[in-house]
């Protein structure tokens, strides 16, 4: 019985519309940032290097290079802190987890674009 209640609550919280994306895609995540009494949106653009599909507990990791330093950020897919998610570019990769990109830099870290 409690299982049905939990499923119902999770279904309500997962009502947010999220575009389909996969590892290798370049995405722009608009994150709500609260500074003092005001709040604003902060864009985080990078390549999805990992995706974890677990219903309400789903998450994805985005990697970008900021002034020569690699920055990774893990987002909960259905978090209220995420305002919007947009896919800028589809990547053509063969692996589900792109952790090898951490060791690559410059042109070697590029990902081919999926043509379709």
Swiss-Prot record:
SUPFAM superfamilies per the UniProt record, alphabetical: Translation proteins SH3-like domain
Record key words, sorted: Ribonucleoprotein, Ribosomal protein
GO cellular component, as recorded: cytosolic large ribosomal subunit
A Pfam cross-reference name: Ribosomal_L19
GO biological process, one term: translation
Disulfide pattern: none
Stretches of the chain forming a coiled coil according to its record: none
PROSITE patterns: RIBOSOMAL_L19 (PS01015)
Transmembrane regions listed in the UniProt entry: none
Superkingdom of the organism of origin: Bacteria
Family per record: Belongs to the bacterial ribosomal protein bL19 family.
Function: This protein is located at the 30S-50S ribosomal subunit interface and may play a role in the structure and function of the aminoacyl-tRNA binding site.
The protein's name: Large ribosomal subunit protein bL19
Biological source species: Pseudomonas entomophila (strain L48)
Lineage: Bacteria, Pseudomonadati, Pseudomonadota, Gammaproteobacteria, Pseudomonadales
